[in-house]
Amino acid sequence: MQVDLLSSAQSAHALHLFHQHSPLVHCMTNDVVQTFTANTLLALGASPAMVIETEEASQFAAIASALLINVGTLTQPRAQAMSAAVEQATRSQTPWTLDPVAVGALDYRRRFCVELLSHKPTAIRGNASEIMALAGVANGGRGVDTTDAAANAIPAAQTLARETGAIVVVTGEVDYVTDGHRIIGIHGGDPLMTKVVGTGCALSAVVAACCALPGDTLENIASACHWMKQAGERAVARSEGPGSFVPHFLDALWQLAQEVQA
């Protein structure tokens, strides 16, 4: 199994495209991470929108550059709004990304996410346990936490990618991005990133934005993982703990975006 690495030039090119196109991302995400997700997108040069009412969600999915579905705080009314948005995104050819939070641990959200797969997401982003559960090869995870190493989920990610046509991202100490055939590994980051709520969910929003960019979508999505890990490393170097990490992380994302424009 060959795992390719992403070059700095590829990452910088994708970030230049990101800033140039400034995708409008319709984030139907969980209640815990909305502010952090919006600020992450803004720092990189995208435009976030959080539209959740069913009628409006469907309408906005046709306007947005990309749609994110994150099931972290799923309720039945929210599931209805998400389904309506995904159906409209499919009709409008708006790329959409699924973040199947805790799908391996809870039955209702697993059934819901499996139903959404029939609408062919452009990308799927999860930890190893979530990806393995969604692929039907394992049940597990400890809520939102993974109990599996990212590398162990590569076969499941490849299967899921081939079955759905999505680009699948498995995040962990090393992130793996696959279209079912090619695999790109992204190293970096810091364990402190796991002590801040929302870094994975925010990455899913950046992945969604990258689905709206021209060029090689696999490389663009892998670049999103690289930016987040780079920013995490820079932020940790300036931080004393999780509380001071967040503002330094947002600053680091902003600085990365500015550097490619220089």
Curated annotation (Swiss-Prot):
The UniProt record lists the keyword DNA damage: no
GO-annotated biological processes: thiamine biosynthetic process; thiamine diphosphate biosynthetic process
Protein's organism: Escherichia coli O6:H1 (strain CFT073 / ATCC 700928 / UPEC)
Chain positions recorded as ATP binding sites: R125, T171
Gene for this chain: thiM
Catalytic activity: 5-(2-hydroxyethyl)-4-methylthiazole + ATP = 4-methyl-5-(2-phosphooxyethyl)-thiazole + ADP + H(+)
Required cofactor(s): Mg(2+)
InterPro entries: Hyethyz_kinase (IPR000417), Ribokinase-like (IPR029056)
NCBIfam families given in the database record: PRK09355.1, thiM
Stated name of the protein: Hydroxyethylthiazole kinase
Pathway(s) of this molecule: Cofactor biosynthesis; thiamine diphosphate biosynthesis; 4-methyl-5-(2-phosphoethyl)-thiazole from 5-(2-hydroxyethyl)-4-methylthiazole: step 1/1
Chain's role: Catalyzes the phosphorylation of the hydroxyl group of 4-methyl-5-beta-hydroxyethylthiazole (THZ).
MF (Gene Ontology): ATP binding; hydroxyethylthiazole kinase activity; magnesium ion binding
Protein EC: 2.7.1.50
